[in-house]
Amino acid sequence: MAESFKEHLQEAFEDLGADNLRKFKSKLGDRRQEPRVTKSAIEKLKDEIDLADLMVGVFTSKDAVSVTVEILRAIKCNAVADDLLRNTGQSESKGALSDESKCASSKAVSKVAFSKVNFIDEHWKELIDRVNNVDPILDILRQKKVITNEDYCTIRNKETPQKKMRELLTGPITCAGNKGKEVLYDALRESNKFLMDDLEDAE
């Protein structure tokens, strides 16, 4: 049954055409409800098969259909949404996730958090060597209370970006543990998108 849902999703995405598929991906990346799909994950999609795999992987099969229909309605692709509902035998969702999906959502969120921590651990040296603009990262970390005002001033006073990153990673981030690394990852992606994409593509 899961495979059948995936096939129907793939067919729906193929029916959208290039322009509407681009709109769908944009809306999916902007979606705020959990579980969320990261824009970096969307950027790595090669075709409609990858998108169907992503939807079923992040959500359960039935909820992948509900979320897809929700986004199709938002981008005015109502005919495709109606066909998908009819082909899968689903009724219009009111936005509530099933218990099965909530469990899967929790696991998905945990997996994303783990991958962020792993990224920081694995790219420690590259981050020290290649992050050139550290101050915006410090601003975010201070706002999120990962570092103190004293940490902020101490690190900003370091002479080079490399010294700033080394002090940040070996000091406050190590003390903050996994939660600190998750926030650092998000701050790096916000302020150093191309570097982060390059490091992730190299994995």
From Swiss-Prot:
Cellular localization per UniProt: Cytoplasm; Inflammasome
Entry-linked InterPro entries: CARD, CARD8/ASC/NALP1_CARD, DAPIN, DEATH-like_dom_sf, NLRP_Inflammasome
GO CC term (a single one): NLRP1 inflammasome complex
GO-annotated molecular function: cysteine-type endopeptidase activator activity; pattern recognition receptor activity; Pyrin domain binding
Pyrin domain span: 1-91
Tissue specificity remark: Expressed in the kidney, intestine and gill. Expressed at low levels in the heart.
Disruption phenotype: Morpholino knockdown in one-cell embryos results in reduced caspa activity and impairs caspa activity in response to infection with the bacterium S.typhimurium. In addition, there is increased susceptibility to the bacterium S.typhimurium. According to PubMed:36112693 knockout animals are viable until adulthood and are indistinguishable from wild-type in appearance.
SMART domains assigned: PYRIN
Keywords: Apoptosis, Cytoplasm, Immunity, Inflammasome, Inflammatory response, Innate immunity, Tumor suppressor
One GO biological process term: positive regulation of inflammatory response
Location of the CARD domain: 112-203
Outcome recorded upon mutating Q10A: Impairs inflammasome activity, but does not impair speck formation
Xref: Pfam families: CARD (PF00619), PYRIN (PF02758)
Upregulating conditions: Up-regulated in response to infection with the bacteria E.tarda.
Keyword Thylakoid attached: no
Keyword Cytoplasm: yes
Lineage: superkingdom: Eukaryota
Effect of E14R: Defective speck formation and impairs inflammasome activity
PANTHER family: APOPTOSIS-ASSOCIATED SPECK-LIKE PROTEIN CONTAINING A CARD, NACHT, LRR AND PYD DOMAINS-CONTAINING PROTEIN 1
Function statement: Functions as a key mediator in apoptosis and inflammation. Promotes caspase-mediated apoptosis. Induces proteolytic processing of caspa and caspa-dependent apoptosis. Involved in innate immune response by acting as an integral adapter in the assembly of various inflammasomes which recruit and activate caspase-1 leading to processing and secretion of pro-inflammatory cytokines. Caspase-1-dependent inflammation leads to macrophage pyroptosis, a form of cell death.
Swiss-Prot/TrEMBL domain comment: The pyrin domain mediates homotypic interactions with pyrin domain of other proteins.
Subunit structure: Self-associates (via pyrin and CARD domains). Interacts (via pyrin domain) with caspa (via pyrin domain). Interacts with caspb; the interaction only occurs in the presence of nlrp1. Component of NLRP1 inflammasomes. Inflammasomes are supramolecular complexes that assemble in the cytosol in response to pathogens and other damage-associated signals and play critical roles in innate immunity and inflammation. The NLRP1 inflammasome is composed of the signal sensor nlrp1, and the adapter pycard (asc), which recruit effector pro-inflammatory caspases caspa and/or caspb.
Protein name (Swiss-Prot/TrEMBL): Apoptosis-associated speck-like protein containing a CARD
Lineage: Eukaryota, Metazoa, Chordata, Craniata, Vertebrata
Gene label: pycard
